[in-house]
Design a protein with these regions (language model features):
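C-terminal structural segment of proteins
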Residues: 1-302
Length: 302
């Protein structure tokens, strides 16, 4: 960590205290690892007292300060009714595991921080976009606004947050949590950052939703009134993701990400088109191994 210009750390969750040169801080795992030579103050929201996870008839509200460890433990600790009625909770451990980080990081890193970093491979972005998460954002002028997480993360390291705005929470609607889901993820290395992460959802009304993250610079979500055919899905992927949108870094070339997204999307389509297995609520884990030439799913990290 190198922050030679920081002169003060203030415990506050009031956006009206923000001024140019400030940065909001929760767990600080990314902020401290990157460092800064421009920030003047850090506004620490960890003492805000927000309930980490709130269950209601509307769904699950996740506070921005909720740690990855708290979220990971939730499916087992949730009220019985939520465990029975929300099979999509099975996505939570899969997305948390996509960090492949130590327990020290899990106990400090926060859901809100991971989303606000705006990294293509951010697993909390993957989770919340796949389940139609809606962000609550507080502004320095005292107003608040809500927007889908799919519209909050807009590029590699870029979000739609205006200067001084603070992410308060993300709510996952009950309708999405009741859905049947499927999960696929790829990395070029055994413990590497996600290169492709695709999540499918089949809602109670038959709507099919496919969300692509990690492979693209921002989340891409496709919706169909029913499970599409293979050709329909492929055509919509090609229409929705142009060449410039595929992410390109050391964790995967755009061509590889494109090919594997098509492949994993078809696996998900076929899985959700088939009858649901009896009493199976959690999404299927990725299948076997991967390499750059003949890739198949493997564990990775952020």
């Amino acid at each position: 960590m190198d922050m030679p210009t920081v002169s003060d750390v203030i415990r506050t969750a009031d956006p009206q205290q923000w001024r140019p040169g400030d940065a909001w801080m929760a767990g600080g795992t990314v902020l401290f690892s990157y460092g800064s030579d421009t920030l003047a103050r850090l506004l620490d929201i960890t003492a805000a007292g927000w309930e980490s996870l709130t269950v209601s008839e509307d769904g699950l509200e996740i506070a921005a300060t909720c740690t990855i460890a708290e979220l990971f433990a939730f499916p087992d600790a949730a009220p019985a009714a939520a465990r029975e009625q929300w099979p999509a909770l099975g996505l939570i451990p899969l997305c948390c595991d996509s960090f492949v980080a130590s327990f020290k990081v899990w106990n400090v890193s926060t859901v809100g921080g991971n989303i606000c970093t705006g990294l293509p491979a951010g697993p909390m972005t993957s989770l919340t976009t796949a389940l139609d998460g809606v962000a609550l954002v507080h502004s320095p002028d005292g107003t608040s606004r809500r927007l889908p997480v799919t519209e909050l993360v807009i590029g590699d390291g870029r979000t739609a947050l205006a200067p001084g705005e603070l992410l308060r929470s993300v709510t996952l609607p009950a309708s999405a949590l009741r859905a049947r889901t499927a999960f696929r993820r790829l990395s070029l290395t055994n413990l590497g950052r996600s290169g492709v992460l695709v999540i499918g959802r089949l809602d109670e009304d038959g709507t099919f939703v496919l969300t692509v993250t990690a492979a693209t610079k921002r989340p891409v979500q496709l919706r169909f009134a029913a499970v599409p055919t293979r050709a329909e899905l492929r055509a919509e992927l090609d229409r929705s993701i142009d060449a410039a949108l595929w992410h390109d870094d050391v964790h995967g070339l755009p061509e590889w990400r494109h090919y594997m997204t098509d492949r994993l999307a078809e696996e998900i389509r076929a899985e959700l088109a088939a009858p649901a297995p009896p009493a199976a609520s959690a999404p299927a884990p990725p299948a076997a191994s991967a390499s750059a030439n003949t890739p198949a799913p493997k564990e990775g990290s952020l």
